[in-house]
Regions:
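Gly/Ser/Thr-rich phosphate-binding loop
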Residues: 1-38, 49-51, 56-59
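A short, polar/charged loop-to-alpha-helix boundary motif
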Residues: 218-226
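Beta-strand->loop->alpha-helix junctions that form or flank phosphate-binding loops
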Residues: 16-23, 27, 42-45, 147-150, ...
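AMP-binding/adenylate-forming catalytic core of the ANL superfamily
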Residues: 20, 56-59, 69-72, 76-77, ...
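AMP-binding/adenylate-forming catalytic domain of the ANL superfamily
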Residues: 184-208, 226
């Protein structure tokens, strides 16, 4: 949110944001004026109705966090993967891209994270995006990815992989500083227990982070149920 606030302040209210997938099952959009009164939102549904559902597939009330579904949108199927296609829909026929979020009373959608990236540490569900959104505001951080790594007692531990800002070294001092920063602004269970550094995080030319590559490096051949 602070980054987009700065972008709008610098360029003016010309920034538009949308949420959609190549599946074509739904689309949301929001302009700068709307965003400034609904900070963090990715907009309202334009081509389908946005529904937030619980584990049972039934709709949840406003501000309750759950799986994001599109109702009444385009039909799709994953080529050669009938199981994935089936799992993307609930009993109402609404489809999901696998994201978690919530809607406010006006119907604006706020994304929390992807369900597949959720970290389960000590029985607590932790969404990496919340931790990433905080750490990226630190002046010594250029980029960050938060993943779950194996932990003997907790099941998983929160690990932040940080790309230091130019002029700063990825060393033990910076790691300690970032952990302290996180603990001062998040509950301790959400704060990273470990900070690792990379010269540059793997991103697609479009800017999409290849988080799975980072996460898989910690798990190796160990199995993980998400």
């Amino acid at each position: 949110v602070p980054v987009k606030e700065q972008m709008i302040a610098w360029w003016g209210p010309i920034i538009h944001e949308y949420y959609a997938g190549t599946e074509g099952n739904g689309f949301t959009a929001i302009n700068s004026e709307e965003w400034l009164t609904h900070k963090g939102s990715v907009g309202k549904g334009l081509t389908a109705q946005v529904m937030i559902c619980g584990e049972d597939g039934e709709p949840l009330p406003p501000r309750a966090e759950g799986m994001v579904y599109f109702a009444g949108g385009g039909e799709f199927e994953y080529h050669g993967d009938a199981e994935k296609t089936r799992d993307s829909k609930n009993q109402h026929g609404w489809s999901t891209l696998g994201d978690v979020g919530w809607i406010d009373e006006e119907g604006y959608l706020y994304l929390t994270d992807r369900k597949s990236f959720m970290i389960i540490s000590g029985g607590v569900n932790i969404y990496p995006q919340e931790v990433e959104n905080l750490l990226v505001t630190h002046p010594k951080v250029a980029d960050v990815a938060v993943v779950g790594a194996p932990h003997e007692e907790m099941g998983e531990q929160v690990v932040a992989v940080v790309q230091p800002a130019p002029g700063h070294e990825g060393d033990e001092a910076l790691a300690a500083e970032l952990i302290a920063f996180a603990r001062a602004n998040l509950s301790h269970i959400k704060a990273p227990r470990r900070i690792d550094f990379m010269a540059e995080l793997p991103r697609h030319p479009t800017g999409k982070l290849y988080k799975r590559l980072i996460r898989d490096a910690y798990w190796g051949k160990e199995s993980r149920i998400v």
